[in-house]
């Protein structure tokens, strides 16, 4: 096996483990439960031999499912899966002590348990592959009682989910949202460690949303979620595709594999296929996805023939933009959003097409769309300084290019502070350096989330890409992210733009085996306030 293949295999295992995942957080209050024997029959799991196994299986009722022993509630089935450093079966004792009534594991897990479990143990050769459907059964197939909208793509998922949720709420719908920034149920926020939660957590969340009166859920669907079965057991009313560019090649062996993971939400032969597809066709991948899907509703903000199009795009004095959305009937709708950038016109068009599909007209959605701001997405930090200061989540080449292109203007200077994540696709680093040096006047290369990699080596790769440009940009290396932000702020003159890119809404910096509190928005605000005090 090549080093690249070994790295991808290791990353898949690490992602599957999710040792950093947050607690479950949201569960239904009332679950009827399912007999363990029926669940075993459903997924084709065998009963492992051991004390008290066969006699009690028929009498066991499962009322919850979890992957984490510390999240077990009485009545749960504990799914003990393979991890990057340990097998979940090692935590079976803790799970049982917390009330687990059964265990689902693989043959390696059975060997680890070695007949020591005082509850029935179901064994399956690939338990992760059946976990989503099993959890959906335990929680009463909640997605069948909701309108579930799944949004996938490299960039724009978070913004589009926020736009859709805003449109739903403006139309009087009770909406749920699941994504990178967190989970929202009827306006109440919960944190999230994953773009798309693990299958048992997702099904529990959906069931809890049903209990709370939610009628429509909009969620981000990552390629990891599709490849690892996190959305198995979920019925999607609408699947939407935003775009595709280089990302996650530490997990996917190729861009083709990355595309195919996304395509499982649209392919007519896929068990995950959404009933209706909405596809932005402004890149090659979008056009290929529209061809793959059956009767896709197409969207274009780039003057391509599509069901939904944008015309008369113009910036507003408040820093947003307005445009006319042309619907499939050829009717124009005046739309205003507080988000800059042509890519956000595309995101808004995707949202409008989704909303129309689920019965919300543009006119109903407009009051919500025009007020929405997305945390950490071109989020403006204003402390009275004479220049524009922004924080954005752009952490991949095309996202960085899009944001810098939006902000660049011949009459003002542009500074960008960014790094690259460790233990992630290293092939993104040099291209990001090149893009920054091509489009910005000041490039400050700093640390992002180095994780377990040497941060100096990461910065070196970015700097090598920037050096290839050989232009007029000033390129500096400042390892400490706080100092890097302060440097860019001190450099800025009235009318300039300072962008802090890569971490967006995140509130911690991962490196050296720990997470330290760090929020780009807080640090940028502090730097601006210090600047004003000195003035």
Swiss-Prot record:
GO terms for molecular function: ATP binding; magnesium ion binding; UDP-N-acetylmuramoylalanyl-D-glutamate-2,6-diaminopimelate ligase activity. The modification N6-carboxylysine is found at residue 262. Carboxylation is probably crucial for Mg(2+) binding and, consequently, for the gamma-phosphate positioning of ATP. ATP binds at residues 153-159. Pathway: Cell wall biogenesis; peptidoglycan biosynthesis. It is found in: Cytoplasm. Meso-2,6-diaminopimelate binds at residues 424, 448-451, 502, 506. Its cofactor is Mg(2+). It comes from Mycobacterium tuberculosis (strain ATCC 25618 / H37Rv). Its EC number is 6.3.2.13. InterPro entries: Mur-like_cat_sf, Mur_ligase_C, Mur_ligase_C_dom_sf, Mur_ligase_cen, Mur_ligase_N, MurE/MurF_N, UDP-N-AcMur-Glu-dNH2Pim_ligase. This is UDP-N-acetylmuramoyl-L-alanyl-D-glutamate--2,6-diaminopimelate ligase. A motif (Meso-diaminopimelate recognition motif) lies at residues 448-451. GO terms for biological process: cell division; cell wall organization; peptidoglycan biosynthetic process; regulation of cell shape. SUPFAM superfamilies: MurD-like peptide ligases, catalytic domain (SSF53623), MurD-like peptide ligases, peptide-binding domain (SSF53244), MurE/MurF N-terminal domain (SSF63418). NCBIfam families: murE, PRK00139.1-2, PRK00139.1-4. Keywords: ATP-binding, Cell cycle, Cell division, Cell shape, Cell wall biogenesis/degradation, Cytoplasm, Ligase, Magnesium, Nucleotide-binding, Peptidoglycan synthesis. UDP-N-acetyl-alpha-D-muramoyl-L-alanyl-D-glutamate binds at residues 67, 195-196, 222, 230. HAMAP family: MurE. GO terms for cellular component: cytosol; plasma membrane.
